[in-house]
From Swiss-Prot:
Stretch forming the signal peptide: 1-28
Note: The operon is cryptic under classical laboratory conditions, but is functional when constitutively expressed.
Signals that turn on the gene: Repressed by H-NS.
Places the protein is found: Fimbrium
Annotated function: Part of the yadCKLM-htrE-yadVN fimbrial operon. Could contribute to adhesion to various surfaces in specific environmental niches.
Ribosomal protein as UniProt keyword: no
Superkingdom assignment: Bacteria
Keywords on record: Fimbrium, Signal
Family statement: Belongs to the fimbrial protein family.
Name this protein carries in UniProt: Uncharacterized fimbrial-like protein YadK
GO terms under cellular component: pilus
Disruption phenotype: Deletion of the operon under classical laboratory conditions does not result in any major effect on E.coli capacity to form biofilms compared with the wild-type strain.
Keyword Signal: yes
Length: 198
């Protein structure tokens, strides 16, 4: 190899070595968290109005009073979830526990509350989120999430009644921190629904 070629080869190797050192930390410093839950007892769902729920327009005065995330208030927007294609295990008409779990698509709930879905529009309304209530039994309405963010929407249902069943819910806007004011703006929250039975 000619000395000029050797120098050029050394420069290319040095350049590639430096380039690799610069690029590697960016690649090596990224983590990927993969989470899955495999169940053979899942169901498909259909949500009324293709899952688009318009909460309308309200004034800031709508949020006055001591309405908590636990307080069901008539006047929210009703929607239904229809359960279908449950891969039923075994034979016979047996009692199952149907779970309809709601979680924030982004994984982020409103600051300071695990029961309020956050407003995803950073320049939108502040100190406002969304709550969802089960209204299947009018004598027993409840926020679908407990204070620690766990799901409460578990319903006893017989195998023969599960496919094609409909479940009623209501959603409304909720003030997050009672000590702070609400500011006007848009509100949007994406919620994922998981349905399975035990």
């Amino acid at each position: 190899m000619h000395p000029t070629q050797r120098k050029l080869m050394k420069r290319i190797i040095l350049f590639l070595s430096l380039l690799f050192c610069i690029a590697c930390p960016a690649i090596a410093g990224q983590d990927i968290d993969l989470v899955a839950n495999v169940k053979n007892s899942t169901c498909k769902s259909g949500i009324s109005n293709q899952g688009n729920i318009d909460l309308g327009v309200v004034g800031v005065g709508y949020f006055s009073g001591n309405v908590t995330p636990e307080s069901y208030q008539p006047g929210g927007k009703e929607f239904t979830i229809t359960v279908s294609d449950c891969a039923l295990q075994g034979t016979g008409d047996v009692l199952n526990q149907l779970h309809i779990d709601f979680r924030a698509l982004s994984g982020v709930m409103a600051a300071g509350s695990r029961q309020i879905f956050a407003n995803e529009i950073s320049s939108g309304a502040s100190n406002v989120g969304v709550v969802i209530f089960s209204t299947q039994d009018s004598a027993n309405t409840f926020n679908v999430l407990n204070a620690s963010g766990g799901s409460r929407s578990v319903y006893p249902v017989m195998s023969d009644d599960m496919n094609g069943s409909s479940w009623k819910f209501s959603t409304r806007m909720q003030k997050i921190d009672p000590a702070l004011s609400v500011t006007s703006g848009q509100l949007m929250s994406h919620v994922l629904v998981d349905i399975y039975y035990e």
